[in-house]
Amino acid sequence: FLIEEIKSDTPTSNWLTAKSGRKKRCPYTKHQTLELEKEFLFNMYLTRERRLEISKSVNLTDRQVKIWFQNRRMKLKKMSRENRIRELTANLTFS
């Protein structure tokens, strides 16, 4: 088994050492989360205008708000699925 050294001028080494263009992950503050959750209770889907309003009020980008809502809908879907499974297994166990 032959292992070659990665030369510093190869595309592979450039890829390995390249810095990601993404921003550092920054968790939401309690205030931001509370405001986003409150809005989610009223609307699971936002219009662009509403998303821009919310993003300004909680000091986030509209993209961050959009992604937060996408993730929150997926979380709700997952929780709903888990509850249905739990109910089915409970019914099978006790019937």
From Swiss-Prot:
CDD domains: homeodomain. Keywords: Developmental protein, DNA-binding, Homeobox, Nucleus, Transcription, Transcription regulation. One of its GO terms (molecular function) is DNA-binding transcription factor activity, RNA polymerase II-specific. Coiled coil: none annotated. One of its GO terms (cellular component) is nucleus. PROSITE patterns: HOMEOBOX_1, HOMEOBOX_2. This is Homeobox protein Hox-D10.
